[in-house]
C-alpha cells in the first residue's frame, strides 16, 4: 500500500536510508563490543568502556532517528541483518580508538553519499535533515577521536601501559 504522506521522496533515497540504518546499527554493535571488552576484569579500563558504551547508544539513536524519518516521509522501513563486528578483542585503547575513527569516517562518507544522492534527486528536506541532525555531529566525533588518539600516543601507548591507565582515569574519567 502506498503512503498517503509521501511526496518528493525518491525510492533510491528510501533504500539508502534503510542502508544507513543498518550501518548505524553495525556501528552501535561494534562500539558495544568494544565497551564490554574494556570492561573485562583483565582489561579494567572502566572509563574507556563507558565511553564506548555511550558511543554505542548514540549510534543506535542515530539509526532510530533515520527510522522515524523514513516513516515521516512515507517511506518503508526494511531492516537487514547486522554484521558481526570484525573483532572481539583489542590490544590497547589506541588501537580501539583508531578503529573507532575509521568507523566514524566510514559512517561520515555514507552520510555524504546520501546527501549527494538527496541533492541529485532534488530532495531539500532530506538534505536539511542530514545537515541539521548528522553532518556536524560526525565532524565533532571524528575530531574528538583524533584528539584522543593524539593524547594516547603522547602518553606512550601502546608501549606504556601506565599511559593507558592515565588516559582512562584523567581524560575519560574527567568527562564522567
Curated annotation (Swiss-Prot):
GO cellular component, one term: cytoplasm
Subcellular location: Cytoplasm
Domain Ferritin-like diiron span(s) in chain numbering: 7-156
Pfam families associated with the record: Ferritin
Disulfide pattern: none
Binding annotation for Fe cation 2: 59, 104, 138
InterPro entries, sorted: Ferritin (IPR001519), Ferritin-like (IPR012347), Ferritin-like_diiron (IPR009040), Ferritin-like_SF (IPR009078), Ferritin_CS (IPR014034), Ferritin_DPS_dom (IPR008331)
Residues annotated for Fe cation 1 binding in this entry: 24, 59, 62
Keyword Iron: yes
Chief place where the protein resides: cytoplasm
Molecular-function GO term, any one: ferric iron binding
Tagged with keyword Oxidoreductase: yes
Family of the protein in this entry: Belongs to the ferritin family.
Misc note: There are three types of ferritin subunits in amphibia: L, M and H chains. M and H chains are fast mineralizing; the L chain is very slow mineralizing.
Protein name (Swiss-Prot/TrEMBL): Ferritin heavy chain B
Gene assigned in the entry: fth1-b
Amino acid at each position: 500500500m502506498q503512503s498517503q504522506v509521501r511526496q518528493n521522496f525518491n525510492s533510491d533515497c528510501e533504500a539508502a536510508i534503510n542502508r544507513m540504518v543498518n550501518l548505524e546499527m553495525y556501528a552501535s554493535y561494534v562500539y558495544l563490543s568494544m565497551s564490554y571488552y574494556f570492561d573485562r576484569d583483565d582489561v579494567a579500563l572502566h572509563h574507556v568502556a563507558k565511553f564506548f558504551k555511550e558511543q554505542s547508544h548514540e549510534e543506535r539513536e542515530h539509526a532510530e532517528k533515520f527510522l522515524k524519518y523514513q516513516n515521516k516521509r512515507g517511506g518503508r522501513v526494511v531492516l537487514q541483518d547486522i554484521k558481526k563486528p570484525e573483532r572481539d578483542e583489542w590490544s590497547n585503547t589506541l588501537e580501539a580508538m583508531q578503529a573507532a575513527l575509521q568507523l566514524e569516517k566510514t559512517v561520515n562518507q555514507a552520510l555524504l553519499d546520501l546527501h549527494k544522492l538527496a541533492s541529485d534527486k532534488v530532495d531539500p528536506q532530506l538534505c536539511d535533515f542530514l545537515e541539521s541532525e548528522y553532518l556536524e555531529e560526525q565532524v565533532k566525533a571524528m575530531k574528538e577521536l583524533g584528539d584522543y588518539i593524539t593524547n594516547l600516543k603522547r602518553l606512550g601507548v601502546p608501549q606504556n601501559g601506565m599511559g593507558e591507565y592515565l588516559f582512562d582515569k584523567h581524560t575519560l574519567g574527567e568527562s564522567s
